[in-house]
């Protein structure tokens, strides 16, 4: 879905990696939370505290999923799922965006 309706958005961004990754929290009418993020070119490692579904909304990422040794490509319109309490890496060569839904 390219449009989120009936939401509240946090004014303050979450800034990571010296400003190279930024996201905003979005609260949906049903009480659930998502984050919308922009990632500048680079390689980054993230950790999860709860399960997540990461949808690529523009551009593409290469992702090193937990317990994997092979990078996988995810482009606009695709997604991948992460369990709680895992680490994963992403890398990209151009600006890319994502929407993270929490499980």
From Swiss-Prot:
The gene is ppnP. Keywords: Glycosyltransferase, Transferase. Catalyzes the phosphorolysis of diverse nucleosides, yielding D-ribose 1-phosphate and the respective free bases. Can use uridine, adenosine, guanosine, cytidine, thymidine, inosine and xanthosine as substrates. Also catalyzes the reverse reactions. Pfam families: Ppnp. HAMAP family: Nucleos_phosphorylase_PpnP (MF_01537). Belongs to the nucleoside phosphorylase PpnP family. The keyword Iron does not apply. Signal peptide: none annotated. Its EC number is 2.4.2.1, 2.4.2.2. GO terms for cellular component: cytosol. It comes from Shewanella putrefaciens (strain CN-32 / ATCC BAA-453). It comes from the Bacteria. It catalyses: a purine D-ribonucleoside + phosphate = a purine nucleobase + alpha-D-ribose 1-phosphate; adenosine + phosphate = alpha-D-ribose 1-phosphate + adenine; cytidine + phosphate = cytosine + alpha-D-ribose 1-phosphate; guanosine + phosphate = alpha-D-ribose 1-phosphate + guanine. This is Pyrimidine/purine nucleoside phosphorylase. GO terms for molecular function: guanosine phosphorylase activity; purine-nucleoside phosphorylase activity; thymidine phosphorylase activity; uridine phosphorylase activity.
